[in-house]
Structure formats: C-alpha cells, structure tokens
Amino acid sequence: MDKCQDKEVAFFGKITAGITHELKNVLAIIRESSGLMGDIISISPEAVIKYQEKIQNSMVRIKDQIERGVNLTDRLNKFAHSTDETLSKIDLQETIEQLVTLAQRFARLKHVVLKTVPPSQEGQPVTLVTRHVQLLMALFASLECCFTVMSAGGEINIGIRKNKGKNAVHVVCKGDLPGQSEFVRNISESENWAALQEISACLEGSANLDETEHCIVLMFPEKISR
C-alpha cells in the first residue's frame, strides 16, 4: 500500500466529522425552532395569532436549515463516491469547488474565508487522470498550511492559472500576513508543509511557495503514471 493511502482513512474521518458536526447544528436549530412553535401552540389558539410573526420566523429558519442539511448530505455523498475508482478522470475546477465546500467549517473555526477563483482562461475544462481522494488531500493540506500563518479575518483564494505553460492550482493567502520571507519560513517549517510535499509526490506533482504574493502553487500531471 502506498504511504499516502495509509492517510486516506484519517482524512476521510476528519472531513466526515466536520460535515456531521454541521448536520448536528442543523438538527439543533430545527429542534429549537419547532420547540418554540410547539410552546406557542400549546398556550392557546389565540396565542397562534398573537405570536404569528414568531411562528413565521421559526418556519423560515426550519426551511433554511432543511435546505442546508440537504446540501450537506449531498456534499458528503459526493465525497464518499470519490473512492469508487482508484484512478479516475476528474475536472480540476470542480474538485477545487468540492474541496472548498468540504473545508468551510475548518476555515470558519479559523475565522478565515475560503473562495474559489474562476479559471484565468475560458475554454475546455482542465481534466486530470489521478487519485481523486489524494488530490483532495493535497488541496486540503495546502489550506492547512495557510491556516498556520493566517490571522482572523483573512481570505484564501483558490483557482487555476497557467504556470510556465502548464495548469497550476494557486492557493493565495490574503489579509494580515507576515512578511514574505517569514511567510515562506513559517510554512516551510510546519508539519503541514511536510505532509503536503508527501501527498504531492504520491500524485507525481509538486508544491512550491511563491512569496511574491503569499501563495502556494500546486502542479500535477495530466495523467498519473501509476
């Protein structure tokens, strides 16, 4: 078994725990809102009219949380299916967008905003034949590298750009950041950077720091050889 495959279970556990925690929050809000409605209704028929606005607000909250819950379960289902094939043809932009949705809770805990950036050039989508789960792991590891140096209120933009004629994923940190040399040193000395290097190597790719714009640049082959 490849050394990166050993870490896939831990990665799956971390992401799944994050999404199920979000689902627990959804259910807690629905329970609280429905409980309030039940309390009002149990007072008397007249109370329903008196507190109609509160009931209406509770119904809106419940509807919003149901939609949020459906979205979360869709994400989890799609994530689970990323293991269907060892090697698969994937749309890189779609994978970036998938990762950003999966990582929202982790960013929120750091008080950091995650955003995807549309491809710099329109045209055919960028596709790779690679290990889908490990690609998600590499993208997530790059975010964790950024989290180590970012302050609350920062922003991470992830998108595809051309780099030396090849497609590359640029993970750009913005906000109250250390100076360029300190940014590079702090990330390169972190455990997350070592993990990112290992995962990138398993994917026959590379991860480099671009200090000119506080950025991590990820490059992967169009088709993995093994």
What residue ranges belong to the model's regions?
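Conserved signal-transmission helix
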Residues: 1-11, 224-226
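Conserved catalytic submotifs in the C-terminal HATPase_c
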Residues: 113-126, 163
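Glycine-rich/acidic phosphate-handling loop/turn and adjacent ATP-lid/helix
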Residues: 166-197
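Histidine phosphotransfer helical core of two-component systems
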Residues: 4, 25-67, 87, 125, ...
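A conserved short beta-strand within the histidine kinase catalytic ATPase domain
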Residues: 154-161
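Conserved ATP-binding N-box helix of the HATPase_c
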Residues: 14-25, 131-154, 194-202
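Glycine-rich ATP-binding loops of the HATPase_c
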Residues: 201-218
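Conserved DHp (HisKA) dimerization/phosphotransfer helix of two-component histidine kinases, i.e.
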Residues: 49-113
